[in-house]
Amino acid sequence: MQLQDSIFIVTGGASGLGEATVRAFHGAGAKVVIADVGVAKGEALAAELGEGVAFCKTDITSEAEAQAAVDLAVSRFGGLHGLINCAGVGPAWKMIGKDGPHPLDAFARTVNINLVGAFNMIRLAAVAMARGEPNAEGERGVIINTASIAAFEGQIGQAAYAASKAGVAAMALPMARELARYGIRVNTIAPGLFLTPMMEALPQDVQDALGKATPFPPRLGRPAEFAAMARSIVENVMVNAELIRLDGAVRLAGK
């Protein structure tokens, strides 16, 4: 699938990996709906990029708001060819903290946003994609989810986050198998240590140390590199049901 004139929804598209993806895809000629809870940033980005970009306030755990994002893509741009799921949260809670056990509601919230929210967007977007006309390869759509290397090497305090991202990674294959009949691919990117807003909030010396933990290149990943990987997946029809670690060969040891 070529990006030119294709229509995408990017969740979490107002900042970080999502914003980089919106910018890259729009720059390549795609039409993009930014689906994000951050209204000010989302509207500002849509205004900056102009024609071919729309913002939709979207809590991905809400059936109504997720459907509204899909409906906006169809009504504003004429259909839907792709979904890039970047929205998520990354809290840290120890199993046994100074105030007691890991809060159950914190675990549930993390899984609800990162896993259930991603699933919610996929199930609704897939219906819209399946209604579209296939291209010459018989392809109607492509879905890319964002997992994390924490799904495989979760650190202390990441039980909820790791569980949610492992679920994201695990659902790609059964989804890809089921949606193959409609010409819809499903893939997953598992980023390593990237310079996202959450990372930028850390002191510079901490950022530098984390970057040096990556074998090569010995630095934090750039959001534009995530966007480039997403574009590569979109444009290569043979990439399906894959999980790609985008991590510079880092393997996090337990601490």
What is the predicted role of each segment?
Residues 39-40, 58-68, 104:
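The beta1-alpha1 cofactor-binding region of Rossmann-like NAD(H)/NADP(H)-dependent oxidoreductases
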Residues 2, 222-246, 251:
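C-terminal substrate-recognition "lid" of short-chain dehydrogenase/reductases
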Residues 127, 176-178:
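Alpha-helical segment proximal to the catalytic Tyr-Lys
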Residues 3-33:
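Canonical Rossmann dinucleotide-binding motif of NAD(H)/NADP(H)-dependent dehydrogenases/reductases
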Residues 89, 100-120, 144, 168:
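Catalytic Tyr-X3-Lys loop
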Residues 122, 164, 172:
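Active-site helix of classical SDR
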Residues 90-108, 127, 131-137, 157-160, ...:
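Conserved mid-core segment of classical short-chain dehydrogenase/reductases
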Residues 148:
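Residue(s) in the substrate-gating loop at a strand-loop-helix junction
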